[in-house]
Amino acid sequence: MNIGFDAKKAIVNLTGIGNYSRRVIAALSKAYPADGLFLFGPRKEPKAALPVAENVSRVYPPAFGGAITYELWRNRYLRGDLRKYGIDIYHGLSNEIPTGLDKSPTRTVVTIHDLIFLTRPETFKAGMRMKLRKKTLYACRHADKIIAISRQTADDIMRFYGIGSDRIAIVYQSIDPIYFTPATAEEKAAVASRYSLPERYVLCVGTIEKRKNQELLIKALPAVDAGMHAVIVGRCTPYADELETLARQTAVAERVHFLS
């Protein structure tokens, strides 16, 4: 079997969706070494290492043109290359699939990470919200199978799009093996010293932005004992200023630590 992947996020994204994409490709390449895995993506050096295996190949867009040509190829004109490489299944790893594949012999799978642009629309700019709504709705209506990464996402797909549960499979995201390697006491002490960490804290990792809802964590701090702190790690946005103001207003500023 030949499986194609929308590898854009695997190539250009260093955070959640990029990590998910790379781990899915790596896991399938090991579990099914007889299958060919074809990564359809831009002509760019990957920001993080892609899986390397004999059954993994990269497929590029036409050499002419730039970003516009790539997006047209990715979203509208991929069918020719899918036929060329004999792709049996095409997996859209981040809420979208190309148009027109329901008229081709290639079957399609799409992973839906969340519908937060519908559940929390105020956390997105209007243009991005409209783009995500259009692409995700199309993917859910036309994909042969939908993978939801959580029960909440599956429920939202059924609620907002009216998709039957028979078309949805809940497959939780994998965890990098590094998180199963216990840190030594010396390593813990070194990190605590480097970042001036308190003895007890809740760790919150993710871009510091409104839809991540770090606000709720800060609001909860007054309800627990004063020895408990919050350590918030992630890329800062202007939302961090709002969180710092909230921490001062709730008298927990000394217990909230930002690392970016």
What positions do the PLM features span?
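Carbohydrate transferase catalytic cores enriched for Leloir-type hexosyltransferases
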Residues: M1-S260
